[in-house]
Curated annotation (Swiss-Prot):
Presumably involved in the processing and regular turnover of intracellular proteins. Catalyzes the removal of unsubstituted N-terminal amino acids from various peptides. This is Probable cytosol aminopeptidase. Coiled coil: none annotated. Mn(2+) 1 binds at residues 273, 350, 352. The keyword Nucleus does not apply. The keyword Amino-acid biosynthesis does not apply.
Length: 504
C-alpha cells in the first residue's frame, strides 16, 4: 500500500481533485466539514445528511456517486461525531471505517480529506499516523505457511492525504514515521504468528543478523559456551530441557553521538513455553508460541527506528530459548546462580521468563545505559489485573523512575498503545523470601505480576529501569487469534520522543 501527501492551496483545492474516491467528514450535529462543503456544490451531501442517510456518528459511512459534477468518481462520507467534541476514539473509528470502505472499493486510488486537526490536543500528524496504521492493520495477512494463499483483496492501493500547503512537511514526516512503525508491527506479528518449529531461538538470531545487514546495525549472537563463560546460570537453567540451542542476541543502532548513553530494550524470547516440569494445561498451549512477544516487539521496534535512521543510540538485547520438560530439565526446588551472583530457588519452572531476563538485565550494566526497558509476556496475573487493554508498567518510585514512567505512559497514549502503572513496593519483596536461596522465583498467588516485577527489580539497581508486562496485549485468542504487534507503537513513539529531546 502506498501513501502520499496532496498539498492544497488556492490553485489545487479539494473540489478540483480528480481521483477514484474522496473521503470527507460530516458531523452528528448535521454539519459538514470544510472538505464536504467544497464538494457540496449541488447540495447532494447536505441532502444525504439531512435525510438521515448518514447519521454523522463516528464511524458511520455513506458512498455517493456523481457528486461535485463528476470530477471525482465517488465521495465517501464518514461520520466524525459532534463537531466541537471529536475525541481520539471518534477519529480512530472514522479512520477505521474509511479503511474498511476502501478495501471493497472499485478503485485503486483515493484521497482522504478529513479535518485532521479536529481532535483536541492532537495535531494533523497524529491523525495521519493513526489512519495509516489502521490501513496497514486491515491489509495485514499471515498466510506464508498456507499452500493456497488467500486472494489479495481488491480496492484502494494508493492513498493520498489532502492537507494545506503549510502542513505538508509535518504530514510527510508523519507518513514516513507511520510506515516505518507499520513495518515494525508487521515484523513483530510475523515472528509471533510463526509456530515454534519455525521461529526458534536460531531463527530469531538469524532475523537479527538479516536486519543488521539491511540497516547497517551492529549484531552479536552469544551461544551456550559464551553464556556459560558469563556465568548466566539462571538463563541457562531454563534451557536444560530443550534440544534447541539458546541464543543471546545483542543488536545496536548507533544513531546518536558516540558519547551519548544508549537506551536499552530487553525482550523476553521464550519461543515455546510448555512450563517445563511444572507443565502447563494442554488447553490453548499452542498459544505459548507467543511467549517470545517481548523479543518480537523489540526487534520490530528496532526495525522501525533503523528505517527512520533515528538519531539515538539504542541497543536491543534478547535472551531466547525454549522451556521444555525432559530428563535433563530443571526441577522444582533446584537452586541456580544468576550472573549477578544471587541465588534463586526455582519453585516453579513455569515462572521462567524472569529467570532469563534477570541475567540479561545484569548483562546490560556494561552499556552504562541512559535507561533500560524490559518487555515480556511475563505473567497471567497481569491479564487478571488489566485485561487485554493496557500493558502493565512497573518501575521504582523516585524522580528518575517517575520521569521514565511518564515518558512511557505518554508515548502509549499518543500511540494508542496504552500502559497502566502498577506498584513496586518493598513490602511485596517479602513474598520472594526463600529458606534455601537468596530468593524464590515465585511469591505465591497474590499480586503475581507485582512480585514478578519485584524479582526483576533486584537486578536493576545500577540504572534507571522500567518493566512492561505485555501478557495481555501481545496477542489475541479466539477467532481473531494472532499477534497484535504491541507494544511496537508505544516503544517507537517513546524512542522518537527521546531522539527529539536529545536533538534540542
Amino acid at each position: 500500500m502506498d501513501f502520499s501527501i496532496k498539498p492544497l492551496d488556492a490553485k489545487s483545492t479539494i473540489g478540483s481533485i480528480k481521483t477514484g474516491c474522496i473521503a470527507v467528514a460530516v458531523f452528528e450535529d448535521k454539519k459538514l466539514s470544510a472538505g464536504a462543503q467544497a464538494l457540496d456544490r449541488k447540495g447532494e451531501i447536505s441532502a444525504a445528511l439531512k435525510s438521515g442517510d448518514i447519521s454523522g456518528k463516528a464511524g458511520s459511512t455513506l458512498l455517493l456517486r456523481g457528486v461535485n459534477g463528476g470530477t471525482t468518481e465517488r465521495v465517501l462520507l464518514v461520520g466524525l461525531g459532534k463537531q466541537d467534541a471529536v475525541t481520539e476514539k471518534d477519529f480512530n473509528a472514522a479512520a477505521q471505517a474509511v479503511v474498511r470502505a476502501f478495501t471493497t472499493l472499485g478503485s485503486s486510488e483515493a484521497v482522504i480529506a478529513l479535518p485532521f486537526d479536529t481532535v483536541a490536543s492532537r495535531d494533523s500528524a497524529w491523525a495521519i499516523r493513526c489512519t495509516i496504521l489502521s490501513a496497514r492493520e486491515a491489509a495485514y495477512r499471515f498466510d506464508s505457511l498456507k499452500s493456497k494463499k488467500e486472494p489479495t483483496a481488491s480496492g484502494v492501493k494508493k492513498i493520498a492525504f489532502a492537507v494545506p500547503a503549510a502542513a505538508v512537511n509535518s504530514a510527510r514526516e508523519a507518513v514516513t514515521q507511520a510506515v516505518a512503525v507499520a513495518n515494525g508491527i508487521d515484523l513483530t506479528k510475523d515472528l509471533g504468528n510463526f509456530p515454534a518449529n519455525v521461529c526458534t531461538p536460531t531463527y530469531l538470531a538469524n532475523t537479527a543478523k538479516k536486519m543488521a545487514k539491511e540497516f547497517k546495525l551492529e549484531v552479536e549472537v552469544l551461544d551456550r559456551k559464551q553464556l556459560q563463560a558469563l556465568k548466566m546460570g539462571s538463563f541457562l537453567s531454563v534451557t536444560n530441557g530443550s534440544v534447541e540451542p539458546p541464543k543471546f542476541i545483542v543488536l545496536k543502532h548507533n544513531g546518536g553521538k558516540a558519547k551519548d548513553a544508549p537506551t536499552v530494550l530487553v525482550g523476553k524470547g521464550i519461543t515455546f513455553d510448555s512450563g517445563g516440569i511444572s507443565l502447563k494445561p494442554g488447553a490453548a498451549m499452542d498459544e505459548m508460541k507467543y511467549d517470545m512477544g517481548g523479543a518480537a516487539s523489540v526487534l520490530g521496534t528496532m526495525r522501525a527506528i533503523a528505517e527512520l535512521k533515528l538519531k539515538l543510540n539504542v541497543i536491543v538485547v534478547i535472551p531466547t530459548c525454549e522451556n521444555m520438560p525432559s530428563g535433563s530439565a530443571t526441577k522444582p526446588g533446584d537452586i541456580v546462580t544468576s550472573m549477578s551472583g544471587q541465588t534463586i530457588e526455582v519453585l516453579n519452572t513455569d515462572a521462567e521468563g524472569r529467570l532469563v531476563l534477570c541475567d540479561a538485565l545484569t548483562y546490560v550494566e556494561r552499556f552504562k545505559p541512559a535507561a533500560v526497558v524490559d518487555v515480556a509476556t511475563l505473567t497471567g496475573a497481569c491479564i487478571v489485573a488489566l485485561g487485554h487493554h493496557n500493558s502493565g508498567l512497573f518501575t521504582r518510585n523516585d524522580d528518575a523512575h517517575d520521569a521514565l514512567a511518564n515518558e512511557l505512559l505518554t508515548a502509549g497514549k499518543v500511540a494508542g498503545d496504552t500502559a497502566w502503572r502498577m506498584p513496586i513496593e518493598e513490602s511485596y519483596q517479602e513474598q520472594l523470601k526463600s529458606n534455601f536461596a537468596d530468593m524464590a522465583n515465585i511469591g505465591g498467588p497474590a499480586a503475581g505480576s507485582v512480585t514478578a516485577a519485584c524479582f526483576l527489580e533486584r537486578y536493576t539497581k545500577k540504572y534507571t529501569w522500567a518493566h512492561l508486562d505485555i501478557a495481555g496485549t501481545a496477542w489475541k485468542s479466539g477467532a481473531a487469534k494472532g499477534s497484535t504487534g504491541r507494544p511496537v507503537p508505544l516503544l517507537t513513539t517513546f524512542l522518537i520522543a527521546r531522539a527529539q529531546a536529545a536533538g534540542k
